[in-house]
């Protein structure tokens, strides 16, 4: 699976759930934790999500907490 495909899946899951867990993403996409970690880092750099321990949350959800 290409990284852009994984990004799309991650962002779709974040639209449905405020938080996604790394373990669940690994199972969903059949990839390693390291691959998911790199994907989450790339999406965070683009401002599309906020990484948290064990997963990620919507970027806008983290802004409204402050």
Role assignments for model-derived ranges:
Residues 2-23, 27-28, 34, 40-66:
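HTH-adjacent hinge/linker in prokaryotic transcriptional regulators
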């Amino acid at each position: 699976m290409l990284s852009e495909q994984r990004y799309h899946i991650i962002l779709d899951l974040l639209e449905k759930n405020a938080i996604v867990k790394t373990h669940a993403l690994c199972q969903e996409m059949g990839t390693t934790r390291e691959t998911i970690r790199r994907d989450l880092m790339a999406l965070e750099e683009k401002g599309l999500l906020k990484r948290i321990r064990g997963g990620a949350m919507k970027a806008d959800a983290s802004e409204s907490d402050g």
